[in-house]
Amino acid sequence: MMFHQMDKISTPCAACKHLRRKCTEDCVFAPYFPSTKLDNYEAVHKVFGASHVATLINSLHPCQREFAMDTLAWEAQVQANDPVNGCLGIIYNLLSQIKDLEEQLAIVKNELASYCIVPTFVPPPSMTNLEMHNNPMMIPEHTPNNGGCLTGQQLYNEAQRFASTQSAQMQETQMQHDEESYRDKSSYQKFGPCFNLH
């Protein structure tokens, strides 16, 4: 531990090395610009100035300082590579790429929309009156409804109609059965049995 502290004091940070001064333990640049990042500090010093950088470090929360210094170093390097535009050149380039991608996306969406074919609805053939009579549960086409949806009263009327139709059919069947039974009984009384075993 003692060796590490002595090595830290004996090796100046990039800022103190650039300024040719002794690096102390309370140096604000040492944690963020070690001797291995001399190029970064020189770029930051050239663009922003040492006093402004020191003021910025002291004004920030300790947990924000490292990220802020990395950002300044990146901006300074970009400014050194493109003195005219700096960071704005990268921003404009990214915005141009976004615009190109949005235009390409719109073209692709239009092409996909041209392949989407909406199927045409073909209504089923209407039933004849005879077919509707044979199927009492079928709702007649002329039945008024609200946009194709039956109301509760209409459903009740249709149920009553179906019940009355079924009742009429059952009564008609019973009458036919009674009539046939009556005919058979009359024939028996008139002609008697074919054979008399007594």
From Swiss-Prot:
Residues 11-112 form the LOB domain. Transmembrane segments: none annotated. InterPro entries: LOB. Belongs to the LOB domain-containing protein family. PANTHER family: LOB DOMAIN-CONTAINING PROTEIN 28, LOB DOMAIN-CONTAINING PROTEIN 4-RELATED. This is LOB domain-containing protein 28. The lineage of its organism: Eukaryota, Viridiplantae, Streptophyta, Embryophyta, Tracheophyta. The gene is LBD28.
